[in-house]
Every structure is written in C-alpha cells, then in structure tokens.
Amino acid sequence: MKVRQLFLLSIMLLAACTTAPTATPQPETESTSTPEATETEAAIAATEESVPTPRPTLGPDEWMTLPVVPEVTDTAREIYARGQELGRDPKHFSKVGDCQTNTGFYLVDFDNEDAYGLGEYAYLQDTIDYYEGSFSRTSLAMRDGYNVAAILTPLRADPKQCEKNENPIACEFRLHNPSIAIISLETNFSDRPADDYGKYMRQIIEYSIEQGVVPILATKGDNLEGDHSINAEIAEIAVEYDIPLWNLWAALQPLPNQGHSTELNDGFHLSFSRNFFDKPKNMLSGWPWRNLTALQALDSVRRGLQEQ
C-alpha cells in the first residue's frame, strides 16, 4: 500500500509545463527537474473553515461567454475586509502559477516605466503605481514545474525561504502579505480528469479565502486536454465561490492562431511582442493581451474592493 501511495503521488506531481514541448520563447531556462520518488507528503487537506454557499452551475460552454475582466462581488469585498482585519497589505498582490507565470514576460514590465506603453489604456497607470513592486516580485508560489498539487505541497516549497512543513502558497502569503492573489495554473496532471484539477484548486481557493486574500482566478489560453474541461472547471469554481474570474481564454480568441506562437505551433506557448499597447502590430500577439487583461482584471478588482 505504501509503495502504491508513493507511486500515485509521484505521478500527480510530475506533470506541469512539461506537457508542452521543451522549446520555448521565454528568456528563462525552464526547470527539467522532477519531484523525487521519496516525496511522501500529500497536498494539504481542504480547510475546515466554512466556505461560501455554492452558486448555480454554469451551462455547457457558458464559461466561453463570460467577460474577460471581472466585476467585484460582495463576497470578494467580505474576503478583503477580513484580510484587512488580519493585517494584509492592501498594496501587495501575489502571483500564483507555473512556467507561464514564472517568466519575465508576465507582468514584470509594469515595474519598469520604459518597458511598456499604455496608449488608450492610460487609466491603468493608477493601478500600476498602487501595486509597485509586486509586478516584478519573484513569488514563492510560482515556479517551472508547478501544478495545482505542487502549490499545496511542502516538499515543493523553497527550502531557503520557507519554513519547515510550509507549502509554497502559505510561504508566499507569509512573506509578501498580499491582499490579492492572481492564480493562473495552466497545466494539469498528465491524462487526469478536470475533476482532479478542481479538487486541488478548491483547496487553493479555500486557503486564500481563509487567509483574507482575494483570489483572481484565470482561465488558461490553451486546450491541451482537447475538450476545454479544465477551463470549464476553473469557471465553475469561480462561480461556486463567487470570486473574480479573469477570462484570458476569451481575450485570446480573436487573435491570429488564438494568440499562440505560429513558430512553435504547439497550442500552448503564446506569441510574443513587447507590452506597447499603442502599437497595433504588437497587439496581434498573445503576450501583450495576457498582460493587458491581467492588469485590467487587477484594476477592476482594486477599484471594486475600495468602493464603499
């Protein structure tokens, strides 16, 4: 039985961004290391704290029509208010994710005024200024090779910065003390159903809520599983917990090749241009839209949370 448990856990933790081809336009070298077979600590159990009453479920493919930029609900305001009582920093947000998050392409440029141009989206500058420092921060809850289970597993945490038995998301929340977490986990375990993805994602969401951190949950741009089941699960979770959903998938659909690289043509890696939103040619690529809509989602949530 013990050998079987070790084998199953090892399989669950192996898959993340390695499901895509190893060629990548990203400047960083993605990790090729995998969890040791000796990993025995399971992902943390779902919090025993009460959670919001489930909302009505979405209809088939209804998630595809949900807006790209979310609106803030009373539930999100309640989470934020609890976080303020706990001492969460209103000017900090954290990134939670895998290799598509752990890259210099994602949000980092907004901490460098020469690296982006807002154009018609100049109203977003207030949000860039408000969260200065969080855009380029290397979160302890993002890393190449992470998936929904790894985020919850102490053995995947940075041993130099995290405490013993502390998982990556708990470590990040302790060290950065955010009031908001943008959660974008693109990949699932190999050949496992979306229900398994949802089981772990719910633990991440419930832990964030318990800690007074407002989760912004993102759909993914790809459909590697073939039936959009993971995005459907992500949207269902957002509706269930009444939390903000950033529908990245919808933003990418009008773009050439749905915003994915035509050179790699793997349906996973986004096409790249720099974040100058006033240059029409740049806005034909996926990465500027990922960064723009992430910033728009953050801006909408910030403004909504601050409304009295």
PLM region spans:
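Bacterial N-terminal signal peptides that target proteins for export
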Residues: 1-7
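Ser/Thr-rich, Proline-interspersed low-complexity disordered segments
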Residues: 9-12, 16-67, 71
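N-terminal module-boundary/linker segments of secreted carbohydrate-active enzymes
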Residues: 51-102
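Conserved SGNH/GDSL esterase-like catalytic core that processes O-acyl groups on lipids
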Residues: 83-196
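Loop/turn elements at helix/coil->beta-strand transitions in domains of secreted/extracellular proteins
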Residues: 89-92, 176-182, 209-216, 241-244
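Active-site-proximal beta-strand/loop segments in catalytic clefts of secreted hydrolases
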Residues: 96-99, 183-188, 218-222, 247-252
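Active-site segments of SGNH/GDSL-like serine hydrolases
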Residues: 182, 188-189, 202-234
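Catalytic His-Asp segment of secreted/periplasmic serine-dependent ester chemistry enzymes
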Residues: 222-308
